[in-house]
């Protein structure tokens, strides 16, 4: 068979959809299964899986350590994933892609600004109506004696409104600025290394998938990757 190369993102190992597709719950178990498949594919078929170093490698190792994965699993990462730094000074990309990326980021920044403005208007409006409602219910005869309680109530309402608004703002802002685009250096390194090696990209990230398509790179969804390796092994190598 033709030699296959894959360039993997952190999500190729850690994504929850990978665990679901494998039918396991724990990250340690799913990581071991994935790395064993990668090892079998490399030994029997010469399939190589590359990981950008140090950016994506450090990200993956840090995640596995935080999840208390055993040392044996982390050793498998060093053994079976080929660590390589993309040659950022030699890889050539069309200028049109840079233009598209800048335009995309500018549109997202403007959208984020509008979301921020709407959040401020919303919090001010809801807070005003809430305080106005409290004032209308206040008994004029006991206004002076309950002034402290009223101020405390106003503060509670304001804090509640701001808390809900900030939470909503964060979710909308994150979606507007980060979903479907490259939002980190490791994401870019995955694409650059795949371009350099003519490798397929393996990830569970909308931004990486979108820009892999624009670069003309092969893309494999993380949840499908273990079954692709199994199919290769079943067809060309040892049966699993």
UniProtKB/Swiss-Prot annotation:
Q: Which InterPro entries match?
A: RNA_free_RNase_P (IPR014856)
Q: Which domain of life is it from?
A: Archaea
User: What is catalysed by this protein?
Assistant: Endonucleolytic cleavage of RNA, removing 5'-extranucleotides from tRNA precursor
Q: Which enzyme class?
A: hydrolase
Q: Write out the entry's keywords from A to Z.
A: Endonuclease, Hydrolase, Nuclease, tRNA processing
Among the GO molecular function terms of this UniProt record, one is: ribonuclease P activity
- Which EC number(s) does the record attach to this protein? 3.1.26.5
Read off the Pfam families from this record. PIN_5
Tell me, what is an example of a GO biological process annotation in this record? tRNA 5'-leader removal
Give disulfide pairs as residue numbers: none
- Which CDD domains does the annotation name? PIN_VapC-like (cd18691)
* Function statement: RNA-free RNase P that catalyzes the removal of the 5'-leader sequence from pre-tRNA to produce the mature 5'-terminus.
Q: Which family does it belong to?
A: Belongs to the HARP family.
Please identify the protein, giving its name as recorded. RNA-free ribonuclease P
């Amino acid at each position: 068979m033709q030699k296959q190369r894959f360039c993997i993102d952190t999500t190729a190992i850690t994504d929850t959809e990978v665990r679901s597709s494998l039918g396991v719950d724990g990250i340690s178990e799913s990581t071991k299964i994935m790395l064993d498949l990668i090892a079998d594919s490399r030994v029997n078929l010469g399939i190589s899986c590359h990981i950008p170093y140090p950016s994506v490698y450090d990200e993956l190792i840090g995640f596995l350590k935080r999840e208390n994965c055993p040392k044996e699993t982390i050793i498998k990462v060093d053994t079976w994933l080929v660590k390589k730094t993309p040659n950022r000074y030699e890889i050539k990309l069309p200028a049109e892609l840079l233009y598209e990326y800048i335009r995309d980021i500018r549109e997202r920044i403007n959208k984020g600004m509008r979301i921020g403005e709407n959040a401020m208007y919303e919090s001010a409006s809801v807070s005003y109506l809430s305080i106005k409602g409290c004032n209308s219910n206040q008994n004029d005869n006991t206004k002076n004696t309950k002034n402290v309680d009223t101020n405390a109530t106003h503060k509670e309402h304001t804090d509640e409104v701001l808390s809900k608004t900030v939470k909503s703002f964060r979710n909308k802002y994150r979606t507007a600025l980060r979903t479907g685009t490259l939002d980190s250096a490791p994401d870019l390194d995955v694409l650059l290394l795949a371009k350099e090696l003519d490798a397929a990209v393996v990830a569970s990230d909308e931004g990486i998938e979108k820009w892999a398509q624009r670069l003309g790179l092969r893309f494999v969804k993380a949840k499908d990757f273990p079954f692709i390796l199994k199919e290769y092994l079943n067809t060309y190598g040892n049966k699993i």
